[in-house]
Regions:
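Short beta-strand element of the alpha/beta-hydrolase
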Residues: 81-90
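Catalytic nucleophile-loop/oxyanion-hole region of alpha/beta-hydrolase
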Residues: 95, 116-136, 143, 200
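Short amphipathic alpha-helix adjacent to the substrate-entry channel of hydrolases
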Residues: 96-115
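N-terminal cap/lid segment of alpha/beta-hydrolase-fold proteins
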Residues: 30-80
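Bacterial Sec-dependent N-terminal signal peptides
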Residues: 14-37
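The feature captures the conserved acid-bearing segment of alpha/beta-hydrolase catalytic domains
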Residues: 177-249
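C-terminal catalytic-base region of ester-bond hydrolases, centering on the histidine
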Residues: 222-350
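Gly/Ser-rich "nucleophile elbow"/oxyanion-hole loop immediately N-terminal to the catalytic nucleophile
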Residues: 77-80, 127-162, 170
Length: 350
C-alpha cells in the first residue's frame, strides 16, 4: 500500500501547482489594476473584502517534521487571544507561499490561522495526520496569548480536507475546543482516514460544515466528499455542499480545477468570491452567531450565497448548492476514485 500511495503523491505534485485564469465581482465590475489575475477585483465591502488588520507571523520548529517550521498568521498588535483556524494543506503544499493569500486574508480579518507542513513522501498517511495534530497542539500550548480555543475552525484542501474530519473530531471531542463556535471547511477532498462511522455521528451540535468541490477537478472523485457530507451528523440547516464551475469571459477564464484556491499559479476573483467570501461569512456565523452571515455561508442556495460577480454585463457561473449531493461524473474521470483500494471508506461509495 505504501508504494501505491507514493505513486499517488507523485501524481498529486504534478496537479497541485497549476490553475487557469478567472474573473468576477458582486456588481458589474470594471477592470481594476490590482494583483489579482483577470479583470475582476476583490470585493470592496461585505463578506470577502479584506480586513483592516496588518498581518504578523510567528514560526516555530515542527514537532515531528525536522527542518520545517509551523507558522501562525495573526492580526498584528493582538493583545488578547483570537479565534483560530487550523489549516491542513494538500500534498506538496508544504510552503505557506502556495496559498498565502488565504492565510493573510484570515489574519487581516482579525483571526488566527495555523499552517502546519507535513512530509509529502517517505511517511504514512497516519504519520502525516500525527504531524498536523502535534503541530496544532503545540501552537495551542505555546501561544495561549494569541489563540482562543473557544472558537475553532478546521480547514483543508485535498489530502488536508480529508484529514480535517479526524483532526476536528480530536479537537472538538478530545480537547473540548470550540465550545463557543466550531466549523469545518473542506475543499476538493481526498480520502478520509482515522475516523469511524460512530465518530462521524458524534460531532458537537454547534459544528457547521461547508464542503466544496470543483467541477473540472479530475484528481479527487467527488464521491469522497459526498460520502462524508452525507454521513456526518451535522443537520442540513448547518451544512452546505457547494459546486463551483468555471466561467469563460472573452479575455479570461476563471477555472474550477483541483487547485482552487491558490496564490501561486492564478490568484484571482474565484479565490475571493468562491472561497474567501464564504469563509468570512462562516466565521461570522459560527463565532459570532450572525444570522445574516448564515445566509451567505449556509444559505441553502440563497441569492446572497450563490451570486457571483459580473464583468461588462456577463455574470460568472453561480455557485450550485445542495444538501443532497450526487456524483455528476463516472469514477473513471478521476485519478483517486472512491472505489480505490486506498480508500478506508470504500464501502460507502455509491
Amino acid at each position: 500500500m505504501k508504494a501505491s500511495i507514493l505513486l499517488m503523491i507523485s501524481f498529486f505534485l504534478l496537479l497541485s501547482c497549476s490553475k487557469n485564469e478567472p474573473d468576477e465581482s458582486n456588481q458589474d465590475a470594471a477592470s481594476i489594476d490590482d494583483d489579482l489575475a483577470g479583470p475582476i477585483s476583490r470585493p470592496k465591502a461585505g463578506y470577502g473584502s479584506d480586513g483592516n488588520y496588518q498581518v504578523a507571523k510567528i514560526s516555530f520548529p515542527s514537532p515531528l517534521y525536522s527542518g520545517k517550521n509551523v507558522e501562525i498568521f495573526y492580526p498584528k498588535g493582538t493583545i488578547s487571544p483570537k479565534p483560530v483556524i487550523f489549516y491542513s494543506h494538500p500534498y506538496g503544499g508544504e510552503l505557506s507561499e502556495y496559498n498565502i493569500g488565504l492565510y493573510e486574508f484570515i489574519a487581516k480579518k482579525g483571526y488566527v490561522v495555523v499552517f502546519a507542513p507535513y512530509p509529502t513522501t517517505g511517511v504514512t498517511v497516519e504519520e502525516r495526520y500525527d504531524t498536523l495534530w502535534q503541530s496544532f497542539k503545540k501552537a495551542v500550548r505555546d501561544y495561549p496569548g494569541i489563540i482562543d480555543t473557544k472558537k475553532v475552525g478546521f480547514m483543508g484542501h485535498s489530502f488536508g480536507a480529508g484529514a480535517c474530519f479526524a483532526l476536528a473530531h480530536r479537537g472538538f471531542i478530545d480537547e473540548g475546543w470550540g465550545e463557543n463556535g466550531r466549523f469545518i471547511f473542506a475543499m476538493a477532498q481526498w480520502y478520509s482516514y482515522e475516523i469511524t462511522q460512530a465518530e462521524l455521528q458524534s460531532f458537537p451540535e454547534n459544528t457547521k460544515l461547508i464542503t466544496q468541490v470543483y467541477n473540472d477537478d479530475i484528481t479527487n472523485d467527488h464521491r469522497l466528499a459526498i460520502d462524508i457530507f452525507k454521513n456526518i451528523n451535522i443537520p442540513d440547516t448547518e451544512k452546505d455542499f457547494i459546486l463551483i464551475k468555471k466561467s469563460v469571459l472573452p479575455t479570461f477564464t476563471y477555472t474550477a480545477e483541483h487547485n482552487l484556491p491558490n496564490t501561486q499559479s492564478s490568484y484571482d476573483a474565484y479565490d475571493y468570491y468562491g472561497i474567501y467570501r464564504l469563509l468570512d461569512a462562516m466565521i461570522d456565523y459560527s463565532f459570532n452567531g450572525n444570522t445574516a452571515a448564515k445566509n451567505v455561508a449556509l444559505g441553502n442556495g440563497s441569492k446572497e450565497q450563490v451570486t457571483m460577480p459580473s464583468y461588462n454585463g456577463q455574470a460568472l457561473s453561480p455557485l450550485e448548492v445542495t444538501d443532497n449531493p450526487s456524483a455528476l461524473y463516472p469514477q473513471s474521470k478521476y485519478s483517486f476514485q472512491c472505489s480505490g483500494l486506498n480508500n478506508p471508506r470504500i464501502a460507502n461509495c455509491n
